[in-house]
Amino acid sequence: MDWLHVVALAVIQGLTEFLPISSSAHLILPSQLLGWPDQGLAFDVAVHVGSLAAVVLAFHREVAHILRDWVAQCRGGPATPESRLGWAVIVGTLPAVVIGFLLENVIESYLRASLVIAITTLLFGLLLWWADVRGSRRHALTAMTLRNALIIGFAQALALIPGTSRSGITITAALLLGFTRQAAARFSFLLSIPLILAAGSLKGVELIESGEGVAWGTLVAGTLMSFVAAWLCIKLFLAALDRIGMLPFVIYRLILGIVLLVWVA
């Protein structure tokens, strides 16, 4: 992989992992539409590490408080809003993990296609717009219940279909449940931590088993660029979210979906 591909793919991963526009779609499309070579397992691991480091850094205080209170409750301490949020993240993660494990081969064989990406980009983009318009936006993140987390978790499992957008569908579900934009986005980002960790770990195991060669210079560059892009994306997205809402991302998804439909027609 040349340096242009390294820079482009790392920045794409970092930006699209947390914006409601689908990282998987943007990583699949360069190979399918532009003929770029597959980035390989090692590079996949590298950009996942960069994205994971970015979201943990961006939410380091919240993550530290959640872990502290969750561990304390497990040892017999009192329940707190942070410990309950920890349980909510666990419950919200389970559906995607279980369904992904059961249907991985089906998804890889039948759903990683440009037409599927075009349809899901359009469909779930419109659903995001509807949720943003119709959601009551009354509940703060402290109002997250295990029932809400489970519903959002099943919505997150839909993001196994390329083009759906993990952040997009979880924010959509949270908005429809009445959460504020900030609460919906923050819970979506917290949910990303165990999933990115799991995905990166699985790819790491696959990399070790495959015996694939590692170009360390490329991996370090990919990790750093993915980290910087993801961290900036998270900070800017949260800062602008209440002002701009979801409409800019919906418009982008509609344009992208239409372009893809024309391309594959």
UniProtKB/Swiss-Prot annotation:
Give any single GO term for biological process. Answer: peptidoglycan biosynthetic process
Q: Name one GO molecular function term.
A: undecaprenyl-diphosphatase activity
Its primary localisation, in coarse terms, equals membrane
Q: Where in the cell is it found?
A: Cell inner membrane
Top-rank taxon, per record: Bacteria
Question: Where does the chain cross the membrane?
Answer: 1-21, 40-60, 87-107, 113-133, 151-173, 188-208, 214-234, 244-264
Q: How is this protein positioned relative to the membrane?
A: Multi-pass membrane protein
Keywords of the record? Antibiotic resistance, Cell inner membrane, Cell membrane, Cell shape, Cell wall biogenesis/degradation, Hydrolase, Membrane, Peptidoglycan synthesis, Transmembrane, Transmembrane helix
One of the record's GO cellular component terms: plasma membrane
Q: Which residues form a coiled coil?
A: none
Which EC numbers characterise this protein's activity in its record?
A: 3.6.1.27
Catalytic activity, as annotated = di-trans,octa-cis-undecaprenyl diphosphate + H2O = di-trans,octa-cis-undecaprenyl phosphate + phosphate + H(+)
Q: What else is known?
A: Bacitracin is thought to be involved in the inhibition of peptidoglycan synthesis by sequestering undecaprenyl diphosphate, thereby reducing the pool of lipid carrier available.
Q: Which PANTHER family match?
A: UNDECAPRENYL-DIPHOSPHATASE
NCBIfam families according to UniProt: PRK00281.2-4, undec_PP_bacA
Reported function: Catalyzes the dephosphorylation of undecaprenyl diphosphate (UPP). Confers resistance to bacitracin.
Q: Which family does it belong to?
A: Belongs to the UppP family.
HAMAP family per record: Undec_diphosphatase (MF_01006)
- Its name, as the record gives it, is Undecaprenyl-diphosphatase
Q: Which gene encodes it?
A: uppP
